[in-house]
Amino acid sequence: MKLVIVSGRSGSGKSVALRVLEDLGYYCVDNLPLPLIGSLLEQLKGSNDLVAISVDVRNMPEQDKVLVQQLSNLPAGTEITSFFLNSSDKVLLKRYSETRRLHPLSKSRVSLQEAIKLEGKLLEPMSKLVDHYIDTSNLNIYDLSDQVRQILLGSVDKELVIYFESFGFKNGMPTEADFMFDVRFLPNPHWELALRPLTGLDEPVAEFLNRQPLVNKFIWQIENLLETWLPHLERNNRSYLTIAIGCTGGQHRSVYVAEQLAKRFSNGKHKVNVRHRELDHAKA
């Protein structure tokens, strides 16, 4: 089992790091007291081999010896990777001033500046024990995400799941689409009597549309558009991308185009899913 422990001063980016880990398939728990880690791992044993927790200053032992002892009591075979995120006092003060959030130690009737300094002192033992110390003072959320992925995977790239969805405009547009393309201008198999009862999944319809230069040109241009911008979308902390293709009824053209695009992007670089809204509704 792999366990990632994320600690650090509040406002330094622990939540960002935890979101990255969640996207990588980790079971994430925020602000878990260290004595409960062993119980958590026992409960997840056999069901999830990737676990990540963030540790709050309020859950940290005062002495580093206690911390080491608690970690040594974890189940045998646990592979631990630890991060400590930190920023300068000036940057943390600025971030808290901008978000107007309450610092975890502010309830002790101390000023924000005093709370930030106190937290740094309390977390100092932890900062000396971790595997990876990251100063986020000059990092934005994308830079930090890249660093976490680079450490865990050896690469900043993340697997983007692409959904191609066909639909019919007469039944409304899908609300979850990131990109939407209207193919109602393409030649319509509906007007071919032999093709009317078929769908874009059937070979006769596919052959008809494949013979249309306009159809092939459109698919080629959409493919180029997506190939150009996918790397930038992947770097933007996206986990998935939904591309909707719509025709009038969602039976012929949109189905065929969605299938063709899905085939072209099923090249091992991306995880691709294709769904046909109107055809799925007809089966239900």
From Swiss-Prot:
Is the keyword Zinc in the record? no
GO MF term set: ATP binding; GTP binding
| Residues bound to ATP | 8-15
| Transmembrane intervals | none
Question: Is Cell inner membrane among the key words of this record?
Answer: no
Highest taxon of the source? Bacteria
Annotated binding of GTP, by residue? 56-59
Q: Which UniProt keywords apply?
A: ATP-binding, GTP-binding, Nucleotide-binding
Q: Which InterPro entries match?
A: P-loop_NTPase (IPR027417), RapZ-like (IPR005337), RapZ-like_N (IPR053930), RapZ_C (IPR053931)
Family designation: Belongs to the RapZ-like family.
Q: Per its database record, what is this protein's job?
A: Displays ATPase and GTPase activities.
HAMAP family registered for this protein in UniProt:
RapZ_like (MF_00636)
What name is this protein filed under?
Nucleotide-binding protein Sputw3181_3461
| Protein's organism | Shewanella sp. (strain W3-18-1)
Q: What is the lineage of its organism?
A: Bacteria, Pseudomonadati, Pseudomonadota, Gammaproteobacteria, Alteromonadales
